[in-house]
């Protein structure tokens, strides 16, 4: 695939790795360096054209690879250039491979759901005129070494029949594990996968959470505290030297002393008459201007 600018100068290496920042690779010493904005624009043009060519080859309604998608996702793109062909001294692009990590729910051979985050093949394209020349295997092998993964550990997003034949021919990937999504995984995918931790659904909070562990909960199940007021700790008071006698009545408090005997009303009034008045009461009667001795006798 040719472009109106110098691809060989833009991509010094045979295989260039681009991330979401789309930064131009380091320039060779002694080469003319255009403005950085122009270099990034050229990279975006290459990515857009490669995405359109890949969508056309796979009969997709719209490209799944573009510069805007690369900038908004944490994907990695491997671009292979043709070092032998230099039309008009500008170089050419052979193809590309786009990968990225994704969280997936996949089924194993026992049809159990597993939450994994494998490296996924998201898009793969080699120019039609350069296929069956070993370029695809070279690009794929470079990606495996760079990402440090094995072919059976990959998940492929909507692979074409050409890609499935390619993987079967070069990496002996044939037996697939049926899935309910658009990703394809092969036998041996779970060989190096750690078993996922079983997560229980969160429970609705009921009241305050008590700060004790599960072992403390088991202990509390054995030693159940009695209800109030039986759970109140008794007060340790110093017993008196001569404790008062307790009443045998069930309605009286055990701490209350014996009641005084009942006094008849007539005897109570007689004792009040014989009781001498208080000095303060005498003073009030003496200072009362309207009170006569006769009236005081009648009121008494």
Curated annotation (Swiss-Prot):
Gene that specifies this protein: ATAT1
Modified residues (Asymmetric dimethylarginine): 282
Residue numbers bearing the Omega-N-methylarginine modification: 300
Family from the record: Belongs to the acetyltransferase ATAT1 family.
Pfam families assigned to the protein according to its UniProt record, in alphabetical order: Acetyltransf_16 (PF05301)
Region (Disordered): 229-263, 280-300
Protein's cellular compartments: Cytoplasm; Membrane, Clathrin-coated pit; Cell junction, Focal adhesion; Cell projection, Axon
Site (Crucial for catalytic activity) residue list: 58
Organism annotation: Sus scrofa
Function of the protein: Specifically acetylates 'Lys-40' in alpha-tubulin on the lumenal side of microtubules. Promotes microtubule destabilization and accelerates microtubule dynamics; this activity may be independent of acetylation activity. Acetylates alpha-tubulin with a slow enzymatic rate, due to a catalytic site that is not optimized for acetyl transfer. Enters the microtubule through each end and diffuses quickly throughout the lumen of microtubules.
Positions where Phosphoserine occurs in the chain: 249, 253, 292
Reaction catalyzed: L-lysyl-[alpha-tubulin] + acetyl-CoA = N(6)-acetyl-L-lysyl-[alpha-tubulin] + CoA + H(+)
Matching HAMAP family: mec17 (MF_03130)
Binding site for acetyl-CoA: 124-137, 160-169
Name assigned to this protein: Alpha-tubulin N-acetyltransferase 1
GO annotation, cellular component aspect: axon; clathrin-coated pit; cytoplasm; focal adhesion; microtubule; spindle
Keyword Coiled coil: no
Keyword check for Membrane: yes
